């Protein structure tokens, strides 16, 4: 357990040393994030429509009798 915590501590220390501390908001691809959000939204809508269609069809379909 102590070896794992020591390893994590070393990795965190190295990442703090080698990472830049300045934020660069100009480098964030806002258009790509918006486009991905639209695609994900359309996918979720399609899943919702498919689920609703399945519910409606299963409601009106006659149920099979079990033996």
UniProtKB/Swiss-Prot annotation:
Domain of life of the organism encoding this protein: Eukaryota
Signal sequence, renumbered to the chain: 1-23
Keywords for the protein's UniProt record, in alphabetical order: Antibiotic, Antimicrobial, Immunity, Innate immunity, Secreted, Signal
Gene Ontology CC annotations of this record: extracellular region
Matches recorded under InterPro entries: Moricin_fam, Moricin_sf
Predominant subcellular localization, coarse grouping: secreted
Gene Ontology annotations of biological process type: defense response to Gram-negative bacterium; defense response to Gram-positive bacterium; innate immune response; response to bacterium
Induction comment from the UniProt entry of this chain: By bacterial infection.
Pfam families on file: Moricin
Keyword set includes Secreted: yes
Compartments reported by the entry: Secreted
Similarity comment: family membership: Belongs to the moricin family.
Oligomer status and interactors: Monomer.
Its job: Antimicrobial peptide. Active against a broad spectrum of Gram-positive and Gram-negative bacteria including methicillin-resistant S.aureus ATCC 43 300, S.aureus BAA-39, pathogenic strains of L.monocytogenes, K.pneumoniae, E.coli O157:H7, S.typhimurium and multidrug-resistant S.typhimurium DT104 with minimum inhibitory concentration (MIC) of 1.4 uM for all except for S.aureus BAA-39. Also active against Serratia marcescens. Probably acts by disturbing membrane functions with its amphipathic alpha-helical structure. May protect a developing embryo from bacterial infection.
Identification of the protein by name: Moricin
């Amino acid at each position: 357990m102590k070896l794992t915590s020591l390893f994590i501590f070393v990795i965190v220390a190295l990442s703090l040393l080698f990472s830049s501390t300045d934020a660069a908001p100009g480098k964030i691809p806002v258009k790509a994030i918006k486009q991905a959000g639209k695609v994900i939204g359309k996918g979720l809508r399609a899943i919702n429509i498919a689920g609703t269609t399945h519910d409606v069809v299963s409601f009106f379909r006659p149920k099979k009798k079990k033996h």
